[in-house]
Amino acid sequence: MRLSVRKVLLAAGCALALVLAVQLGQQVLECRAVLGGTRNPRRMRPEQEELVMLGADHVEYRYGKAMPLIFVGGVPRSGTTLMRAMLDAHPEVRCGEETRIIPRVLAMRQAWTKSGREKLRLDEAGVTDEVLDAAMQAFILEVIAKHGEPARVLCNKDPFTLKSSVYLARLFPNSKFLLMVRDGRASVHSMITRKVTIAGFDLSSYRDCLTKWNKAIEVMYAQCMEVGRDKCLPVYYEQLVLHPRRSLKRILDFLGIAWSDTVLHHEDLIGKPGGVSLSKIERSTDQVIKPVNLEALSKWTGHIPRDVVRDMAQIAPMLARLGYDPYANPPNYGNPDPIVINNTHRVLKGDYKTPANLKGYFQVNQNSTSPHLGSS
């Protein structure tokens, strides 16, 4: 027993001596750097400023802050999942499922900035805006790059990230933003009927949800306009559904990505290598396995309480600002392309395939509920 105690003490002494030796060596090196005038105490440069990933095709992909990231967002239930599935169908693009963590981290960063006391504490501790921004930049890029397969163009779809478009544009100056815009009445009806839990939204009240929708889209739209139309494109869900080819050509031109017919048939690439990866827990998965169709456009009509319909222009003034008629029930969104009419007939007849990895899931989970930060 005594021998083992001696061994422990000896080992601890050796470890302490080693730590002290390392610290002393570091101090000597720092002193030399200061004397040589080469040390900058305020900046550190990482050895590797890029993330390097190897794809299944054995192609090396390099990602950095200067790369043209794509951010897809909007109020939940506005078509963000459809948009990212269409982009995922492009051979050069990978979006993947919602990370859920990125909007939360952005919200924390915003909260620190808004709190004067917390900002002072961070500054006093040396955790300046420059330090925080560098950390946020590295974290967000790491999550986007590594939560899915590598691709030439990376995109992120977390609905609420576009509440921070201005900040993200500063972190990633070559990024582009797609703001999904949908008739708020349709978005809210979808939230309520599909029980999509979103923080702050009372799913028992159309009036409350429309008020919260108005506030959220107002913030996102203002951020989009501030970033500028050369960097942020509002995409109307109704027009994307009615005229997919025309809409997608405009979107890909905006993003600087070559056209590919695969974006018109995202449903054929679900679950396939290099295709569209879907999450079993996102509420829109059972919808985006279908071809683009008219099924969800006007489902909300006749379901909103009369008093809310009467006060719609006051409850949700952003409807009119975005070009929707707050008094039209149902509104006329336009005439669909022939391919969309054909797709709708197929969907109504059940003439579409459920991916093998999702078979049986929808029947088991159709009526289940789970907390969501927001999906669409």
From Swiss-Prot:
Binding site for 3'-phosphoadenylyl sulfate: 77-81, 182, 190, 194, 237, 284-293, 299
Membrane topology, Lumenal segments: 26-376
GO cellular component: endoplasmic reticulum; Golgi lumen; Golgi membrane; trans-Golgi network
Annotated compartments: Golgi apparatus membrane
Gene Ontology MF: a single term: protein-tyrosine sulfotransferase activity
Main location: Golgi
Keyword line: Disulfide bond, Glycoprotein, Golgi apparatus, Membrane, Signal-anchor, Transferase, Transmembrane, Transmembrane helix
InterPro entries: P-loop_NTPase (IPR027417), TPST-like (IPR026634)
Bilayer disposition of the protein: Single-pass type II membrane protein
Record site: Transition state stabilizer: 157, 284
Gene3D superfamilies, A to Z: P-loop containing nucleotide triphosphate hydrolases
Protein name, UniProt field: Protein-tyrosine sulfotransferase 2
Organism: Mus musculus
